[in-house]
């Protein structure tokens, strides 16, 4: 079974031990003025608000202009638009300040003052224009007078998609607050501490501990506070020291978040109830607490009650009324912990398993190597799907190899069919045995029924049960021999499946022999070589004839080239006939 992912003592100490800060970090964190830019727009029937950007004034105060940097407006899509902002406070005309302020936000007319987005070609433009853009990804909104008191109460403006639009598409709000700036190191530690605290609160809720219960402390006067993994690991380290384990400087105590933090360990003897113990709250202390089982001891050393005497080595023989557990001890009864045990002899709880236990932190001790293997598991190497191509053999060789592997696949299919037949025989033998047993049970049931009826009617003096009932007599037929035969068949098949296939006697033929796996891959190249040897003489003879013919024609042409044909008498006769025909 795979081990759970551990939460180690080393990691906890690393998270909770802060880095030694410098002198500047030990002083009280400074306070600064911070500007916020919020955008509000309507999305369907829902009103949405988001923080576009924040910017801090200089440490000595807001004595110089500040600029917001943000990527985009939520209500204006980048591209086919030119965002424009209107404020009421910087309007010079009374019509722009007094009319349709809630609707238009200072720009009900075209002559009102509007801050149109300008292309940010130089940094000096920020001193001239309030709203600029680099044309790609960033907008710049400048506050020229951050020292003005209006920003503390907040300034509201309207956002238009185009300067010529009649109505705005969103609302902007800019305000200034005095905040406490936390250094980055302390901020990171604070976030980690908050996360650990949240996890401990969740686990504390799951543990369902009593606020006054002595859960993980050994002093019965101490009150257990909220559950803490640090406290759990500390108690685990204390137990390790008490156990006398040495040379643990390079070991790790680990616990798992997915498992209960405590485990109940059975004690070898009953509690000493003679002394006066501190009063504990009555009732159930905790539920679903797992019990530790020693794999080397099949029995529990001591039990107060048990449903089976074989489970315990020793059972409590005294009275189980009004028993109290001392500090650090509990009664474990069916996954439930309690400090008091009050069981009468006729109570149903007397048939449950109740043990004296002590709660121990559920920790695991790992060495350096074991922890390294858990945190960084070894990488599994992937096997090559087509090894000939991976190791650099040519594609032709790979194709030939894949073709030769067909024989091995055929042999594997034949072996699988043989195995399927044997399994089928085993299933049939098992079914036959079960059917035989069922027939025996049916036969016994019929005989018992007939005997019961015969004995009830006492009809032995009238010819026996069969004659009185007027039906055939049924007797038990011992079919155990058939069962034994079927079992022997199963044993033979089992031995045949486990025995290596080394004998040459196969029911399917010689092609199912293991030797076939080695022979078949060589058949294809042998056949190819034989085919080449068969056609090689014909090919060679054809090539030889062609070469001879070409050589003969070439030699004749070279020898007859200087000679020409001489005229004969037949040639003169042909010329005379030609002239006569032309004269006619």
Curated annotation (Swiss-Prot):
Transmembrane segments: 519-539
SUPFAM superfamilies for this protein: Virus ectodomain
Residues carrying the site annotation Cleavage: 383-384
Keywords attached to this entry: Cell membrane, Cleavage on pair of basic residues, Disulfide bond, ERV, Glycoprotein, Membrane, Signal, Transmembrane, Transmembrane helix, Transposable element, Viral envelope protein, Virion
Membrane-side (Cytoplasmic) residue stretches: 540-584
Glycosylation sites: 69, 247, 272, 276, 308, 313, 322, 334, 342, 346, 478
Tissue specificity remark: Low expression in skin, testis and trachea.
Location(s) in or outside the cell: Virion
Extracellular side of membrane: 23-518
Disulfide bond sites: 466-473
Pfam families membership: TLV_coat
Location of the region described as Fusion peptide in the Swiss-Prot/TrEMBL record: 384-404
UniProt motif CX6CC: location: 466-474
Gene3D superfamilies named among the record's database cross-references: 1.10.287.210
Motif CXXC, chain ranges: 251-254
Keyword Ribonucleoprotein: no
Posttranslational mods: Specific enzymatic cleavages in vivo yield the mature SU and TM proteins.
Signal sequence bounds: 1-22
UniProt short sequence motif CKS-17, positions renumbered to this chain: 449-465
GO cellular component annotations of the record: plasma membrane
Domain comment as written in the entry: The CKS-17 immunosuppressive domain is present in many retroviral envelope proteins. As a synthetic peptide, it inhibits immune function in vitro and in vivo.
Family the UniProt entry places it in: Belongs to the gamma type-C retroviral envelope protein family. HERV class-I F(c)1 env subfamily.
Other remarks in the entry: Orthologs in P.troglodytes and G.gorilla (truncated).
Name of the protein described by the UniProt record: Endogenous retrovirus group FC1 Env polyprotein
């Amino acid at each position: 079974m795979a081990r759970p992912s551990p939460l180690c003592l080393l990691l906890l100490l690393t998270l909770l031990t802060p880095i030694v800060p410098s002198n500047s970090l030990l002083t009280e964190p400074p306070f600064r003025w911070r500007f916020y830019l919020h955008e509000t727009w309507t999305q369907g029937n829902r009103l949405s608000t988001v923080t576009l950007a924040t910017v801090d004034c200089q440490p000595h105060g807001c004595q110089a202009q500040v600029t917001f940097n943000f990527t985009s407006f939520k209500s204006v899509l980048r591209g086919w638009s030119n965002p424009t902002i209107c404020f009421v406070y910087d309007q010079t005309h009374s019509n722009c300040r007094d009319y349709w302020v809630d609707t238009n936000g200072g720009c009900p007319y075209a002559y009102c003052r509007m801050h149109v987005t300008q292309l940010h070609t130089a940094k000096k433009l920020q001193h001239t224009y309030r709203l600029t853009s680099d044309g790609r990804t960033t907008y710049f909104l400048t506050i020229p007078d951050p020292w003005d008191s209006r920003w503390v109460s907040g300034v509201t403006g309207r956002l238009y998609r185009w300067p010529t639009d009649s109505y705005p598409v969103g609302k902007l709000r800019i305000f200034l607050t005095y905040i406490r700036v936390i250094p980055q190191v302390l901020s990171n530690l604070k976030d980690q501490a908050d996360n650990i605290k949240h996890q401990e609160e969740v686990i504390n809720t799951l543990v369902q501990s009593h606020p006054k219960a002595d859960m993980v402390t050994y002093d019965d006067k101490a009150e257990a506070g909220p559950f803490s993994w640090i406290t759990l690991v500390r108690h685990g380290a204390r137990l390790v020291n008490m156990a006398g384990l040495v040379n643990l400087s390079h070991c790790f105590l680990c616990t798992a978040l997915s498992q209960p933090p405590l485990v109940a360990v059975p004690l070898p003897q009953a509690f000493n109830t003679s002394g006066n113990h501190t009063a504990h709250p009555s009732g159930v202390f905790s539920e679903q607490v797992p019990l530790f089982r020693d794999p080397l001891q099949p029995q529990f050393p001591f039990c107060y009650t048990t449903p089976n005497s074989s489970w315990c080595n020793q059972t409590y023989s005294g009275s189980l009324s009004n028993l109290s557990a001392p500090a650090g001890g509990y009664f474990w009864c069916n996954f439930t912990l309690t400090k008091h045990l009050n069981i009468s002899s006729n109570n149903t709880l007397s048939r449950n398993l109740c043990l004296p236990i002590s709660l121990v932190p559920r920790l695991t001790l790992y060495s350096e190597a074991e922890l390294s293997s858990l945190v960084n598991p070894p990488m599994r190497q992937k096997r090559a799907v087509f090894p000939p191509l991976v190791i650099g053999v040519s594609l032709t060789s790979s194709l030939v190899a894949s073709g030769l592997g067909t024989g091995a696949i055929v042999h594997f299919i034949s072996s699988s069919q043989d195995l399927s037949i044997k399994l089928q025989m085993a299933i049939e033998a098992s079914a036959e045995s079960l059917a035989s047993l069922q027939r025996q049970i049916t036969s016994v049931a019929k005989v018992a029924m007939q005997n019961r009826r015969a004995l009830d009617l006492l009809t032995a003096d009238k010819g026996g049960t069969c004659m009185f009932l007027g039906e055939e007599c049924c007797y038990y037929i011992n079919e155990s021999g058939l069962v034994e035969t079927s079992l022997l068949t199963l044993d033979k098949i089992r031995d045949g499946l486990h025995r290596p296939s080394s004998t040459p006697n196969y029911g399917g033929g010689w092609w199912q022999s293991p030797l076939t796996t080695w022979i078949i891959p060589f058949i294809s190249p042998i056949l190819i070589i034989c085919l080449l040897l068969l056609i090689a003489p014909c090919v060679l003879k054809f090539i030889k004839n062609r070469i001879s013919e070409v050589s003969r024609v070439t030699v004749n042409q070279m020898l007859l080239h200087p000679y020409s044909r001489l005229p004969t008498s037949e040639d003169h006769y042909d010329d005379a006939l030609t002239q006569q025909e032309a004269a006619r």
